[in-house]
Amino acid sequence: MNQERVFKVLLGPHVSEKATVLADKKGQFVFKVATDATKLEIKKAVESLFSVKVERVTTLNVLGKSKRTARGLGKRNDWKKAVISLQPGQDLDFSSSAE
């Protein structure tokens, strides 16, 4: 996988109450990813960007909500979420990768 694709696969961390509990208790981290990204691409992107070993990648497609607007019904965009499980002894630190 080329370097350009690595940066397009991971769109950013997904911060929610459930994602925080997963990170604290199980060592799993949640990312927003490109909708066309595969599990293998996500695994390689996380391993190359954060220098960690990934044990498992679980993905799910999140459907956008229907919202009412002044012009009728609208719909938010669908997006893809990936839950990354790291191998035992590994930890992912977002602050050190930004420096």
UniProtKB/Swiss-Prot annotation:
InterPro entries: Nucleotide-bd_a/b_plait_sf (IPR012677), Ribosomal_uL23-like (IPR013025), Ribosomal_uL23/eL15/eS24_sf (IPR012678)
Gene3D superfamilies attached to this UniProt entry: 3.30.70.330
Source taxon at top rank: Bacteria
Entry keyword annotation includes Ribonucleoprotein: yes
Record GO biological process: translation
Protein's UniProt keywords contain RNA-binding: yes
Gene Ontology MF, one: rRNA binding
One cellular component (GO) term of this entry: ribonucleoprotein complex
Keywords: Ribonucleoprotein, Ribosomal protein, RNA-binding, rRNA-binding
UniProt record similarity statement: Belongs to the universal ribosomal protein uL23 family.
Known role: One of the early assembly proteins it binds 23S rRNA. One of the proteins that surrounds the polypeptide exit tunnel on the outside of the ribosome. Forms the main docking site for trigger factor binding to the ribosome.
Subunit note: Part of the 50S ribosomal subunit. Contacts protein L29, and trigger factor when it is bound to the ribosome.
Name the record gives this protein: Large ribosomal subunit protein uL23
Taxonomic classification: Bacteria, Pseudomonadati, Pseudomonadota, Gammaproteobacteria, Pseudomonadales
GN (gene name): rplW
